[in-house]
């Protein structure tokens, strides 16, 4: 938090129920208080004499700018939206009732071609405002003009991690590198990873250049992966491999990463994600609207593959609501497996908070802890 002069604030939250993670990475709720000093949580624990807390922490008592009585309500980590196209607020409900390829190529791409560095800004501000209404405090974005979104997010005080969405219709590895350097220097709230849109929009030469960039900067790589049956089928026809197997062979994942959607995996795909500890980001509402399918969350969890949850863009979702995504992720997994106990509620909550933070490389923002 910052005050009206742009200075970081010291805030004490007390009389709160606080959602924390225990040593088994399971959620616990404690009664107590939470202190924020500047931009860092410095205490989470029982309520007691502040002087006693400061003695234990070997610190001077902060001069509080605000002391907030939470009145027994819950303090919890912000949701981490692990896949988004925030700027697509202007395409909400523009193209309903279409499968992915028609929706993308005939409806979305032509409209997106009209975007520029100025008209995209209010679209992104609108998306950030909507994120905050459902407690989303960070987005993992694939968007046009990444330096612009970094500026917008920083001005809003919103944390934004971006990944390159380059494809063979436009852009180049050189532009990806330029964006990587610019965004990572914009603000402490913004960062950028190497990636590309998808195998089906990207030629082999560009994919190899992206892999080379990932090695140069030791960056994780993310892309849309195995979202539809047709995507996997066509990749097999082109290369004799699934998108996961192809990108693994190209050396994309030496420094981690993952995929968005991950609906249609074969055994070898699961093996690669498990071995590399890649994150599968599920986007249930988007996959329903475009009739793409239901991701195999139970198997991801059983095989120890990290999972996070994303809304995807508002054009393929129609809202940016993590509560809706959590419900759908849970309910669809139960129906897919015909097993009401296949994934617990706290596991889904973990995916929407800690799982997303880990996917974005935000290990210091994954829980409420000092």
Language-model segments: what does each one mean?
Residues 90-122, 156-164, 229-254, 276-279, ...:
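Active-site gating loops and adjacent loop-to-helix segments of metal-dependent hydrolytic enzymes
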Residues 6-58:
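N-terminal metal-binding scaffold of metallo-dependent hydrolase/deaminase domains
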Residues 173, 229-241, 269-273, 291-300, ...:
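Histidine/acidic-residue-rich catalytic or RNA/ligand-binding cores of hydrolases
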Residues 92-157, 178-186:
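Alpha-helical scaffold segments that flank or form the walls of functional sites
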Residues 249-256, 298-370:
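His/Asp/Glu-enriched, well-ordered alpha-helical/loop segment
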Residues 148-263:
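Metal-coordinating catalytic core of metallo-dependent amide/deamination hydrolases
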Residues 19-31, 290-291, 297, 357-370:
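Acidic, glycine-enriched loop/beta-strand segments at the rims
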């Amino acid at each position: 938090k910052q005050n009206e002069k742009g200075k970081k604030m010291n805030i004490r939250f007390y009389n709160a129920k606080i959602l924390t993670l225990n040593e088994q990475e399971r959620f616990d709720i404690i009664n107590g208080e939470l202190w924020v000093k500047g931009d860092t949580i410095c205490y989470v624990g029982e309520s007691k004499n502040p002087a006693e807390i400061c003695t234990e922490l070997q610190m001077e008592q902060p001069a509080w700018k605000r002391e907030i009585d939470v009145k027994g309500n819950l303090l919890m980590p912000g949701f981490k939206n692990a896949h988004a196209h925030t700027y697509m607020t202007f395409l909400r409900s523009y193209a309903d009732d279409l499968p992915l390829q028609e929706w993308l190529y005939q409806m979305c791409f032509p409209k997106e071609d009209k975007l520029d560095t100025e008209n995209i800004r209010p679209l992104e501000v609108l998306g950030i405002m909507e994120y905050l209404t459902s407690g989303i405090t960070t987005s993992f974005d694939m968007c046009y003009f990444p330096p612009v979104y970094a500026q917008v997010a920083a001005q809003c005080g919103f944390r934004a991690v971006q990944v390159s969405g380059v494809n063979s219709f436009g852009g180049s590895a050189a532009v990806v590198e330029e964006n990587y350097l610019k965004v990572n220097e914009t603000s402490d709230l913004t960062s950028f990873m190497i990636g590309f849109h998808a195998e089906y929009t990207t030629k082999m030469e560009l994919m190899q250049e992206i892999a080379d960039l990932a090695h140069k900067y030791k960056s994780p790589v993310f892309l849309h992966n195995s979202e539809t049956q047709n995507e996997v089928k066509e990749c097999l026809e082109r290369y004799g491999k699934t998108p996961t197997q192809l990108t693994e062979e190209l050396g994309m994942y030496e420094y981690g990463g993952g995929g968005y959607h991950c609906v249609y995996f074969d055994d070898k795909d699961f093996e690669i994600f498990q071995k590399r500890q890649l994150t599968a980001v599920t986007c249930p509402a988007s996959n329903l609207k475009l009739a793409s399918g239901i991701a195999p969350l139970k198997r991801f969890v059983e095989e120890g593959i990290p999972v996070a949850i994303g809304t995807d863009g508002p054009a393929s979702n129609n809202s940016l609501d993590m509560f809706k995504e959590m419900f759908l992720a849970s309910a669809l997994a139960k129906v897919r497996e015909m097993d009401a106990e296949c994934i617990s509620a706290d596991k889904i909550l973990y995916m929407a908070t800690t799982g997303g933070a880990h996917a974005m490389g935000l290990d210091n923002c994954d829980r409420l802890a000092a």
